[in-house]
Curated annotation (Swiss-Prot):
One GO cellular component term noted in the UniProt record for this chain: mitochondrial inner membrane
Gene field: ATP5
Stated role: Mitochondrial membrane ATP synthase (F(1)F(0) ATP synthase or Complex V) produces ATP from ADP in the presence of a proton gradient across the membrane which is generated by electron transport complexes of the respiratory chain. F-type ATPases consist of two structural domains, F(1) - containing the extramembraneous catalytic core and F(0) - containing the membrane proton channel, linked together by a central stalk and a peripheral stalk. During catalysis, ATP synthesis in the catalytic domain of F(1) is coupled via a rotary mechanism of the central stalk subunits to proton translocation.
GO BP annotations, alphabetical order: proton motive force-driven mitochondrial ATP synthesis
InterPro entries, A to Z: ATP_synth_OSCP/delta_N_sf (IPR026015), ATPase_OSCP/dsu (IPR000711)
Record carries keyword Mitochondrion: yes
Origin organism lineage: Eukaryota, Fungi, Dikarya, Ascomycota, Saccharomycotina
Name assigned to this protein: ATP synthase subunit 5, mitochondrial
SUPFAM superfamilies, per database record: N-terminal domain of the delta subunit of the F1F0-ATP synthase
Keyword Oxidoreductase assigned: no
Amino acid sequence: MSSRVFVRSLAAAAKAGVKPPIQLFGLEGTYASALFTAASKTTSIESAGKALASLSKTIAKDAKLGAILANPALPAGDRTVVVQTLAQKTPGMDAAVQNLMQVLAENNRLNLLQGVAGEFTKLTDAHNGLVQATVTTAQPLEGKLFRRVEKALAQSSFIGAGKTLKLENVVKPEIQGGLIVEVADRTVDLSIASRISKLNQVLKESI
């Protein structure tokens, strides 16, 4: 299956009433969207998601494999062997995902595989009514505080009725304190670093 044929399945599926729940951008988003529609017609979205997650974990644990996938000079024959090996080592490999890997190999884009997996997760979360959110803090949020933030966000207009919040805590010491909340394309920056930056800007403008 060529890249054009695989991606065209997205348009064909849309005409049949099957389309991704949200719009994604970039190459990873395009491939993830095409996979979503292909899986919904041929295998299952859940099956494709599990196979991608398994592949992503395998790559993350194997630095050598990651380097091979990222090598743009890898010969076409070797790329095919890599795809076949990954398919054999992945329990319950999904046919639609294997087709995707073949397309990525043909176009020398196997380095996009983990990115596609991440974008596909966004689609499945949206399909299942999950809203992804990230709260960035200088130190890890303790259980009780994390649940308080989670509850406050879940009840906010950011999430919406009938949706379920999927919250992740990202630690970045450089924000110095406070927190940064990101939900979809919306960001609320309450970090100390941001406040200092704004103060410095005001001081510069007043001099």
